């Protein structure tokens, strides 16, 4: 593997990054210094820097789908919306101060009508970004799809403000006893990724989950999890509210589980410590690969699609395409739609690394 390209500009540990899909090579990185640095990989130096954190680290970034001249930035308990059309400057358009605790992740829906901001209290604020007002709060669980330190993945009906389906990765079954990483480290949900709409058309709706026990799970979000026989799973009486479907997620990576989910763990060449981030590839055959980064200072490239297309149940490292060894823990990563310099990695240093995959 060639030495990565190094992007400099931050004064503290980098926290997250995003890559433009409409302008290949343009990326934005954020850090604990409260700044967002913009780079064009066709150029040598960074384009410009936005100081947006007011002394607070920047926790998350996202473009407005369909209009990458608009970017959303979270810092502290605030989300700011900027116009970056000028390329070398930015203009503050809106500020949203609905979260009571520190925001750790933001995301827009594909229609650019809502923005979700998940904070440390467990609340998810759904913001109507067309009318610039608060729409709804998702609470006491975890939009749409959320994960948390309760080891649960929740699919929401956010129009009603309540969970629709819950996957509990903390519920172990007998198939997991050989996985010591799972036993020693809780299966906290550290990060989620969903493929873009044109990738979803090829498969069922899926979600990649970065777990604290070192496993990367690929879940069919429209299938019911393994049923847990309890009173809550009984058929509701007439006139009563229906309870969300709750179940455990088996972590048998050799065959997935009866729901057709895939679990990529250490036995398949995966991570030996918590997985901190996960994303779907945007280069080449879009969505073909899942790329994960972890506290083991490793980046893994997985060909997950063969499992869902052919139903392969091979053992060994058939799903693992490549592995990168880094010098620091991985905080975040993203990909660009180019054939080279297509993997951007933010680690615990202040320097962003850019690799070529494929």
What are these regions (language model features)?
Residues 36-40, 79-85, 124-128, 153-157, ...:
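WD40-repeat beta-propellers
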Residues 83-88, 158-164, 220-256, 303-312, ...:
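Short loop/turn segments immediately following beta-strands, especially the blade-tip
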Residues 30-33, 73-77, 111, 118-121, ...:
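Conserved strand-to-loop turn within each blade of WD40 beta-propeller repeats
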Residues 198-224, 252, 259-262, 266-309:
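Loop/turn-rich, solvent-exposed surfaces of beta-rich toroidal or solenoidal domains
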Residues 18-24, 61-68, 106-113, 118, ...:
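Loop/turn segments within WD40 beta-propeller blades
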Residues 7-14, 51-58, 64-65, 96-103, ...:
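WD40/WD-repeat beta-propeller blade N-cap
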Residues 1-11, 43-45, 257-266, 314-321:
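A short helix->beta-strand "capping" segment at the edge of beta-propeller domains
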Residues 332-358:
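Blade-level signature of beta-propeller repeat domains, shared across WD40, Kelch, NHL, RCC1
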């Amino acid at each position: 593997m060639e030495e990565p390209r190094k992007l400099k500009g931050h004064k503290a540990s980098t926290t997250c990054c995003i890559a433009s899909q409409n302008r290949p090579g343009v990326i934005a990185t954020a850090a604990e210094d409260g700044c967002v640095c913009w780079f064009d990989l066709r150029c040598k130096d960074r384009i410009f820097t936005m100081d947006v954190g007011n002394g607070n680290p920047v926790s998350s970034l996202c473009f407005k789908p369909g209009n990458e001249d608009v970017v959303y930035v979270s810092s502290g308990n605030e989300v700011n919306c900027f116009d970056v059309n000028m390329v070398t400057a930015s203009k503050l358009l809106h500020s949203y101060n609905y979260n009571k605790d520190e925001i750790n992740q933001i995301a827009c829906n594909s229609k650019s009508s809502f923005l979700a901001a998940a904070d440390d209290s467990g609340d998810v604020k759904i913001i109507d970004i067309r009318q610039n007002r608060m729409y709804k709060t998702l609470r006491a669980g975890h939009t749409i799809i959320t994960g948390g330190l309760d080891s649960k993945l929740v699919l929401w009906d956010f129009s009603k403000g309540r969970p629709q389906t819950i996957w509990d990765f903390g519920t172990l079954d007998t198939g997991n006893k050989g996985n010591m990483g799972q036993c020693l480290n809780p299966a906290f949900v550290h990060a989620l990724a969903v493929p873009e709409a044109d990738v979803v058309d090829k498969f069922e709706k899926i979600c990649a989950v970065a777990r604290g026990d070192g496993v990367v799970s690929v879940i069919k979000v429209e299938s019911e999890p393994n049923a847990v026989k309890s009173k809550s799973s009984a058929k509701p009486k007439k006139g009563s509210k229906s309870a969300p479907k709750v179940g455990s997620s088996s972590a048998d990576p050799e065959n997935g589980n009866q729901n057709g989910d895939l679990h990529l763990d250490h036995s398949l060449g995966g991570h030996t410590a918590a997985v901190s981030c996960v994303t779907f590839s945007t280069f080449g055959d879009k969505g073909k690969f899942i790329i994960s980064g972890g506290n083991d200072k490793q980046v893994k490239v997985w060909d997950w699609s063969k499992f869902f297309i052919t139903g392969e149940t091979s053992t060994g490292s058939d799903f693992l395409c490549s592995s990168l060894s880094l010098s620091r823990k991985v905080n975040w990563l993203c990909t660009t739609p180019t054939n080279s310099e297509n993997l951007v990695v933010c680690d615990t240093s202040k320097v962003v690394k850019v690799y070529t995959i494929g």
